UniProtKB/Swiss-Prot annotation:
Protein name per its UniProtKB record: WAS/WASL-interacting protein family member 1
Residues carrying Phosphoserine: S142, S234, S340, S350
GO function term, MF aspect, one: protein folding chaperone
Subcellular location field: Cytoplasmic vesicle; Cytoplasm, Cytoskeleton; Cell projection, Ruffle
InterPro entries in alphabetical order: PH-like_dom_sf, WAS/WASL-interacting_domain, WH2_dom
GO biological process: actin filament-based movement; actin polymerization or depolymerization; protein-containing complex assembly; response to other organism
Originating organism: Homo sapiens
Domain notes: Binds to WAS within the N-terminal region 170, at a site distinct from the CDC42-binding site.
Tissue: Highly expressed in peripheral blood mononuclear cells, spleen, placenta, small intestine, colon and thymus. Lower expression in ovary, heart, brain, lung, liver, skeletal muscle, kidney, pancreas, prostate and testis.
Basic and acidic residues: bias regions: 480-494
Region entry Disordered, spans: 1-503
Chain intervals with Gly residues compositional bias: 65-104
Amino acid sequence: MPVPPPPAPPPPPTFALANTEKPTLNKTEQAGRNALLSDISKGKKLKKTVTNDRSAPILDKPKGAGAGGGGGGFGGGGGFGGGGGGGGGGSFGGGGPPGLGGLFQAGMPKLRSTANRDNDSGGSRPPLLPPGGRSTSAKPFSPPSGPGRFPVPSPGHRSGPPEPQRNRMPPPRPDVGSKPDSIPPPVPSTPRPIQSSPHNRGSPPVPGGPRQPSPGPTPPPFPGNRGTALGGGSIRQSPLSSSSPFSNRPPLPPTPSRALDDKPPPPPPPVGNRPSIHREAVPPPPPQNNKPPVPSTPRPSASSQAPPPPPPPSRPGPPPLPPSSSGNDETPRLPQRNLSLSSSTPPLPSPGRSGPLPPPPSERPPPPVRDPPGRSGPLPPPPPVSRNGSTSRALPATPQLPSRSGVDSPRSGPRPPLPPDRPSAGAPPPPPPSTSIRNGFQDSPCEDEWESRFYFHPISDLPPPEPYVQTTKSYPSKLARNESRSGSNRRERGAPPLPPIPR
C-alpha cells in the first residue's frame, strides 16, 4: 500500500503545472481556439437557416394551384363515393380545391377547414368549406347527384348555410374522431363509410340506391344526405338549402334553425338518419337530447321525402343513435362506443339487414349475459349501439326498437311502439341491470362460490406469535465489506491528499 502513494503525488503537480501553464501558453492560441466562438458572438459566420414549410404550401397548392388537380383527385374520391362521382368530380374542378382540403382533412381537419374556407368562400364562408371539406363528401355525394348539383351545393354551402355548417363544424370534428373508423373518406366518406359501411356492408345497394335516387329526384340531396353522405349531411343540409328548389328545403330550414339553436344537433338530425351521427355529432347528441323532437322531425322530413321512405324506417334505427344522445350522461359514451364500435357496429347492422335482425333482439337478452363475462363496462352500451346499427339498418327492428326505446325514448313521438319497447327495454335501466347482471354473474356468483370455499379463521384459531426478544445483530458480510472498502479506500485515497503538502 505505501508504494502506490508516491506515484499518485507526481500527477497532482503535473496537473497543477498544467493549470498554471494553460493561461500563459494558451493566450496566443486562445484566439484561434475561440475564433469560432468570437465569430459566432459577432455573428459573422452565422447563416440564416432556410426552412421549407411544405405544410402551408401543400394546403395552398391543392386549394388554389391544384384546383384542377384537386378536381381530378376528388373525382377519385367521387369514384369511391359512387360510379358517377368521377365525372362529378371533374365537373366540380373549381370546387376541387375544397374537395382536396376535405380529403386532406383526415390529417389536419382544422387547418384545412380554415384554409378551405379562406380560399374558397372568403372570410365569412370558410366555415362552410371546412364542413364542406369534411362534407367534401358533399362532393362525392354530389358526384352521384350530378355535376350540375355539385356546383349548386358548393355555392349553397358557400352562400346560404355557412352558419349551419359552421355550427356543424363541431360535428365535423367528431367526424374527425370518427374518421379513425373510416379514415380514407374521413370527412365525406366518414359519414358515408359509417352509413355506407353499415349500409354497404348490410346492403351496399341501399346507399347506392339513395345516392342514385338522389341524382334523379330533387329530394335526392336530402335522401343523399341520408344514404350517400350523412357525414356530408351537414353539407347536404346546406346543399339542400342551397338546392332549395328541392322539396327538401322546407325540412332543411328546420335543420339550419336547429343548427343555429344547437350547432352540433343540426348535423346529427340529418346525420341522425345514420349512426354516423354519433361519430359526427358525438358532441351534438347532447344537444339532440335538448332537441330530440328535432331529430325526430328530420326523420319525418326524411321519411316524407319519397326516395328513401323505406330507408327512413331503417334509419329510424340510426335515430336511436341520436336517441343514444338522449341519455345526456351516456350520450358521449354511446357516441364514443359507436365510434369504437362503428366498424363492428356496421357488421352487426349488415347482419341485421341481411335478416338476422331477430338475432340482434336475441342478442339483446344475451348482451347482459355476454356483457357480464365480456366487457363489463362498455359492452352493454355497445349492444345498444350494435342494436342501433342493426335496427337502424333493418326496418323489422321492432325487437331492436327496445334498444332504440332507451335510445329513442326522447324521440318516442315518431314511433308510438317505441314507448312500449322503451318500457320493456328501459334503455337507461337496462345498462344498469346489465351492469348489475354482470356484477351478479361475475361478482355475485363468483362471490358466492369463493365465499363458500373460503372463510376467515377467528383469532383464537391462530397460533400466538413468538415473543420478541431484543438482541444486537451482527452482519459479518456487511462488516467485511465496510472494513475492506473503507480501509483500503481510505488508505489509497489518503495518499493523494499528501501531494498537496509538497506543493
